[in-house]
């Protein structure tokens, strides 16, 4: 199977991470003694798609990866992938933008003295 241009453009570290994810999914399936056919059936995907998942194919939708992880009982960790509380880069950037000091707000004039 030929990989798309967008998949080839992925950074090496991302391709490695996807490959590891696929290998981990394959190992988890085998540890649970699930055949490829049964796993694919439970995830509502074809055996070919499951093979692509287990290879870490970047062209497979995130929803399919989520479905496979659900079948394995591992979907609960998906919510932590981009958890804002764990986003060290984002938190650092946010901290850099914080004001150095905060001044007390000036009281607003009541508008007295203006004719009504």
Where on the chain are the PLM-derived regions?
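A short, Lys/Arg-rich alpha-helix, primarily the initiator
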Residues: 6-31
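Helix-turn-helix DNA-binding elements, focusing on the entry/boundary residues of the two helices
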Residues: 25, 36, 47, 62-65
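Short alpha-helical DNA-recognition segment
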Residues: 33-51
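Short, basic-rich loop-to-helix N-cap that marks the start of a DNA-contacting helix
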Residues: 57-70
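Short, charged recognition helix plus adjacent turn
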Residues: 79-116
């Amino acid at each position: 199977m030929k990989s798309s241009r967008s998949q080839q453009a992925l950074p090496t570290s991302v391709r490695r991470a996807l490959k590891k994810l696929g290998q981990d999914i394959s190992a988890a399936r085998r540890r649970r003694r699930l055949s490829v056919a049964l796993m694919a059936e439970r995830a509502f995907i074809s055996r070919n798609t499951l093979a692509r998942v287990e290879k870490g194919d970047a062209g497979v939708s995130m929803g399919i990866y989520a479905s496979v992880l659900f079948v394995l009982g591992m979907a609960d960790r998906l919510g932590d992938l981009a958890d804002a509380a764990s986003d060290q880069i984002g938190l650092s950037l946010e901290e850099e933008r914080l004001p150095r000091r905060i001044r007390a707000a000036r009281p607003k004039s009541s508008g007295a003295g203006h004719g009504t």
